[in-house]
From Swiss-Prot:
Taxonomic lineage from the root: Bacteria, Bacillati, Bacillota, Bacilli, Lactobacillales
Underlying gene: aroA
Keywords per UniProt: Amino-acid biosynthesis, Aromatic amino acid biosynthesis, Cytoplasm, Transferase
Residues the entry annotates as binding 3-phosphoshikimate: 23-24, 28, 169, 171, 315, 342
A single MF term (Gene Ontology): 3-phosphoshikimate 1-carboxyvinyltransferase activity
PANTHER family from the UniProt entry: AROM/DEHYDROQUINATE SYNTHASE, PENTAFUNCTIONAL AROM POLYPEPTIDE
Active site: 315
HAMAP family listed in its UniProt record: EPSP_synth
Protein's name according to its UniProt entry: 3-phosphoshikimate 1-carboxyvinyltransferase
Family stated for the protein in its record: Belongs to the EPSP synthase family.
Functional description taken from the UniProt entry: Catalyzes the transfer of the enolpyruvyl moiety of phosphoenolpyruvate (PEP) to the 5-hydroxyl of shikimate-3-phosphate (S3P) to produce enolpyruvyl shikimate-3-phosphate and inorganic phosphate.
């Protein structure tokens, strides 16, 4: 088996980086553009494999989507403009694509089969199946947990519902709201903790109406959406890898340009500042929720990460775990059981990989206890098909002074950051 040999024993990282477009916003721009009336143009779209799965799904549903002058142009025909697909919709590795598109197709008068790759086929869909069934959709997966493939028969006469989310999940909330846009009457979604709010913001950007009152979102349907011009900011979840690298590699100084800082996504910035990180914000645009972040190597101390903070940094927890291995003292991550049903069981995989490199991490049912600082050594590892695990391991390898780090299945990183290794090499040489 050929494994990728990762760069180790890096000197200070220096330079400026523009991370790819935000994955969450890219998905939603395509989804809402596909059912809005008129021509939607998207600048800065992430061209990773997950977003390409969403684009291909809508092409299969009869929507015309093409690239023109470095923009994605979507010819939306409204909610009535989708056609029954001639084939199965393949969502690849993308849980966002499957869950949000299932919500959207809930109000369509045709049936569809949705499949995914081996990793997606192990991710539970019961969380969207139950609320969509309550709205009148025939939808089912495999076993009680409703694993993909999903079979869905839409319903033009969807019923509005009031639904309290049993878990903190922006994907479930979004699936219900996309269905609610096609249901006659008032749908309410009540969250456990506030999760990323891109769907709510972008529905309004496309001319939709909803009311957000704390953890309660109210939407009266049916509604029509109008095409927009969207500019996608850099993805804070991708910027997180360089943020951490800059903080833990001695002598580093990096400028991360044009990073989206929607407040429902900035948990990682609060955590690293609490741990003692030296970071500064430049060219902050509060209206567009975009800033550049300057980061320099810092001496860090352990912290506790729990409660309402978790949904605001759920995707950044693997790289935060690496950060904690280099901080003085104990870092405790709690209330993060959702990590166990991501692309991998991220609690177990992060613990196993970093411990194999010399870290001191104890996995718990809902998180990790990490003692630092520890020296990291070479190891043979794998992404296990999880892009964020792959990038975490590549940043960890930069700290290794003894031994080699080999990574299997590195192609998983294409999911969200196709130019990751190119950017890494540049920062090591600037």
């Amino acid at each position: 088996m050929k494994r990728m040999k990762l760069r180790t024993n890096a000197g200070p990282l220096q330079g400026t980086i523009q991370v790819p477009g935000d994955k969450s916003i890219s998905h939603r721009a395509v989804i809402l553009g596909a059912v809005a009336k008129g021509e939607t143009r998207v600048k800065g779209l992430l061209k990773g494999e997950d977003v390409l799965s969403t684009i291909q799904a809508f092409r299969n549903l009869g929507v015309r989507i093409e690239e023109k002058d470095d923009q994605l142009v979507i010819e939306g025909q409204g909610f009535q403009g989708l056609n029954a697909p001639c084939q199965t919709l393949n969502m690849g590795n993308s849980g966002t694509s499957m869950r949000l598109i299932a919500g959207l197709l809930a109000g369509q008068p045709f049936s569809v089969k949705m499949i995914g790759d081996e990793s997606l086929s192990k991710r539970p869909m019961d969380r969207i199946v139950y609320p969509l069934k309550q709205m009148g959709v025939e939808i089912s997966g495999e076993t009680d947990r409703q694993f993909p493939p999903l079979q869905l028969q839409g319903n033009r006469n969807l019923q509005p519902i009031t639904y309290t989310l049993p878990i903190s999940s922006a994907q479930v909330k979004s699936a219900i709201l996309l269905a609610a846009l096609q249901a006659k009457g008032t749908t309410q979604v009540v969250e456990k903790e506030i999760t990323r709010n891109h769907t709510e913001e972008m529905i309004q950007q496309f001319g939709g109406r909803l009311i957000v009152d704390g953890k309660r979102i109210t939407l009266v349907g049916p509604q029509q959406l109008t095409a927009q011009e969207i500019t996608v900011p850099g993805d804070i979840s991708s910027a997180a890898f360089w943020l951490v690298a800059g903080l833990i590699i001695p002598g580093s100084e990096l400028l991360l340009k044009n990073v989206g800082v929607n407040p429902t996504r900035t948990g990682i910035l609060e955590v690293v500042e609490k741990m003692g990180a030296q970071i500064a914000y430049e060219d902050m645009n509060k209206k567009e929720q975009v800033t550049s972040i300057r980061v320099v190597y810092s001496h860090l101390k352990g912290t506790i990460i729990s409660g309402g903070l978790i949904p605001r940094l759920i995707d950044e927890l693997p790289i935060i775990a690496l950060l904690a291995t280099q901080a003085q003292g104990t870092t405790c991550i709690k209330d993060a059981q959702e990590l166990r049903v991501k692309e991998t069981d991220r609690i177990q995989v992060v613990t196993d990989i970093l411990n194999s490199m010399g870290a001191n991490i104890k996995a718990t049912a809902d998180g990790m206890i990490i003692k630092g600082p520890t020296v990291l050594y070479g190891a043979n590892t794998s992404t296990y098909g999880d892009h964020r695990i792959g990038m975490m391991t590549a940043i960890a390898a930069l700290l290794v002074k003894q031994g080699q780090v080999h990574l299997d299945k590195e192609e998983a990183i294409m999911t969200s950051y196709p130019t990751f290794f190119k950017d890494l090499e540049r920062l090591c040489h600037d």
